[in-house]
Amino acid sequence: MMKPWENISYFGNQKIISQLDTLYENDKLNSTLLFNGSYGLGKATLAFRYSNYILNQKTEKFTSFSIKNNTITNMIKKNVHPDLIYISNNDQDNSNHEIKIDQIRTLKTKLISKTLNGTNRIVIIDPLESLNKSSFNSLLKV
């Protein structure tokens, strides 16, 4: 199964993609976005795609954005881009677990550092429901 950050093609959610463009054009895009829905709808894929768009410094509308084969995209595919922090409930062996407070503490440490090229810093937590009570409370204090 393809990981969300590896997926170059994206189909669906065109209404959401258009809304993201409209919010950005009207300078009303919040610093936090929450994608909600059933498993398998493409929420994480959309989040990684929008992250790629933002980190590539938005040279076009998101509705017409196509993922380019460049350094930023390759870093995202390898999950090593310093300005994109991905917190998941999957271990190396793909077993699900809760997201623990240590992961959120590590996130806080990473958020203190400067961004690469002065771009935005993006955090994707997938799924948010996997935060335990302590990690959720810690996240609220970021």
What spans do the regions from the language model cover?
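Conserved catalytic/switch belt of AAA+ P-loop NTPases
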Residues: 112, 137-142
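Clamp-loader machinery-focused feature within the broader ASCE/P-loop NTPase space
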Residues: 2-134
